[in-house]
């Protein structure tokens, strides 16, 4: 017997083929409440899309510890070799809307939610170790530059390059995006990075600075612009389809988690700002340390409920993992939760995909869509005479030594914009450099020459061969930008 249709209130629906009218050809009646409910719900099915990372795919999996790092962190998910923790992953493009093609040249989001016994840990990263910006005040400007032009409502290469080249610190990220790794072939064939500098705190209350790396066990595969155009012409959901089908076919993708560890005191002595999101830490100084691996092995049963409504927030950390003075990270600690309260509501943490797997004791009350019992008759204030849900000073972090006057400090005092992009360029093979030249020149085509020259000057400062290679393809003589 087939399941029977009801209203949202559970009442039987007698007619779902024809509206109720006054006579065979008469007007529709207002008392046709099923029609009213059905259309009213339809009118409200679409929630606000994410301002960035709107197009994405997700899956559940398991993280397993393979190496001991307890001397660096007291986080229980790393407490013993073999320990497993459930997680949810969401991979995305960044600039495009929900209907954008997967195989666009763009950064990829790489967000993980670990459902630990101490609460949810959200690691909200990308497939690149750096970013365009150092200062979160410019993040809305980046968004506006890569989104649609306010006059034409089209994506604008001019706007992209005008903004990127006005921020010389963006060259490191631009170099990666324009390289052969700018279009991953699938989500399975890309690395992930926490990108920011975070901190570990161990059982002795010692702090270490840490960067997270996720190495794809499937290897790296990328698409050229021509290959991507062909893929997009056939399937705009190519990455989503690949991830979904690989898990359905039990070809479970895996990534190895590695970390770079910096003693807290080193931050004051290294010749660069270790909290600068436009720079990486040299591996020769801070080598990768293997921690574990995660496997994605279960697809969501409902995309909207589990992927679209998933919410990742870098402010969600557990004891033993914390933040750093990274300005971009500090800005995201507010922005992500605030965006989720707008997009999903103040109680979005009760949506099953976002809900912790451990007990929650909070004084947060009421709000739209509060459907979990609202903590019943438990007192809603603290301190209280019953000692309910008191603070936990045992989990206080060690003090972080800070100094300096409060001011709008200009990060441009550090003018080392070009050494690391130059190092990256020189690590490339001749073939990879040629691909970088070709991709960059193609994307700069049609952009005003003034903007082209600005980018060429930056590339030339990173390495003369970098600027010359692109300039040759744009038919611009080196004398115009050296």
Swiss-Prot record:
SUPFAM superfamilies reported for this sequence: Heme-dependent catalase-like
SMART domains with a match to the protein in the record: Catalase
MF (Gene Ontology): catalase activity; heme binding; metal ion binding
Localization per record: Periplasm
GO biological process per UniProt: hydrogen peroxide catabolic process; response to hydrogen peroxide
Co-factor requirement: heme
Keyword set includes GTP-binding: no
InterPro entries tied to this protein: Catalase (IPR018028), Catalase_3 (IPR040333), Catalase_AS (IPR024708), Catalase_clade1/3 (IPR024711), Catalase_core (IPR011614), Catalase_haem_BS (IPR002226), Catalase_immune_responsive (IPR010582), Catalase_sf (IPR020835)
Residues binding heme, per UniProt: 336
One Gene Ontology cellular component annotation held by this UniProt entry: cytoplasm
Origin: domain of life: Bacteria
Similarity comment: Belongs to the catalase family.
Extra remark: Either KatA or KatC is absolutely required for the protection of the nitrogen fixation process.
Name by which UniProt lists this protein: Catalase
Gene name of this polypeptide: katA
């Amino acid at each position: 017997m087939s399941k029977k249709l009801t209203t949202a209130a559970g009442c039987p629906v007698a007619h779902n083929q024809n509206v109720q009218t006054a006579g065979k050809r008469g007007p529709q009646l207002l008392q046709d409440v099923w029609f009213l409910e059905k259309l009213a719900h339809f009118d409200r099915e679409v929630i606000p899309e994410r301002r960035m990372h709107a197009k994405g795919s997700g899956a559940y999996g398991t993280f397993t510890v393979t190496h001991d790092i307890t001397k660096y962190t007291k986080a229980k998910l790393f407490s013993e070799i073999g320990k497993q923790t459930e997680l949810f992953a969401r991979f995305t493009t960044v600039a495009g809307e929900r209907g954008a093609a997967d195989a666009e040249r763009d950064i990829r989001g790489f967000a993980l939610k670990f459902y630990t016994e101490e609460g949810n840990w959200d690691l909200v990263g990308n497939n690149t170790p750096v970013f365009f910006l150092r200062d979160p005040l410019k993040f809305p400007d980046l968004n506006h530059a890569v989104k649609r032009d306010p006059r034409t409502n089209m994506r604008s290469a001019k706007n992209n390059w005008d903004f990127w080249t006005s921020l010389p610190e963006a060259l490191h990220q631009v170099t990666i995006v324009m390289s052969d790794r700018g279009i991953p072939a699938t989500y399975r064939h890309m690395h992930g990075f926490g990108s920011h500098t975070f901190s570990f705190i161990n059982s002795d209350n010692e702090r270490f600075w840490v960067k997270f790396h996720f190495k794809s066990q499937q290897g790296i595969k990328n698409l050229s612009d021509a290959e991507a155009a062909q893929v997009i012409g056939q399937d705009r959901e190519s990455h989503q389809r690949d991830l979904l089908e690989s898990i359905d076919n039990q070809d479970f993708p895996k990534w190895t988690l590695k970390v770079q560890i910096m003693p807290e005191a080193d931050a004051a002595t290294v010749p660069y700002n270790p909290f600068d999101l436009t720079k990486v830490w040299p591996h020769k100084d801070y080598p990768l340390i293997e921690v574990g691996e995660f496997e994605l092995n279960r697809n969501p049963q409902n995309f909207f409920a589990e992927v679209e409504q998933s919410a990742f927030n870098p402010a969600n950390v557990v004891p033993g993992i914390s933040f750093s003075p990274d300005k971009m990270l500090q800005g995201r600690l507010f922005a992500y939760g605030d965006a989720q309260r707008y997009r999903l509501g103040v109680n979005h943490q009760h949506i099953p995909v976002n809900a912790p797997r451990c007990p929650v004791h909070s004084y947060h009350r009421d709000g739209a869509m509060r459907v979990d019992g609202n903590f019943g008759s438990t007192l809603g204030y603290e301190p209280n005479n019953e000692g309910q849900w008191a603070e936990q000073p045992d989990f206080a972090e060690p003090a972080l030594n800070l100094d300096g006057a409060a001011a709008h400090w200009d990060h441009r005092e550090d003018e080392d914009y070009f050494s690391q992009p130059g190092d990256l360029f020189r690590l490339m093979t001749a073939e990879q450099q040629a691909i970088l030249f070709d991709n960059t020149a193609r994307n700069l085509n049609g952009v005003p020459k003034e903007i082209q020259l600005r980018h060429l000057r930056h590339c030339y400062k990173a390495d003369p061969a970098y600027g010359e290679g692109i300039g040759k393809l744009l038919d611009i003589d080196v004398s115009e930008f050296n």
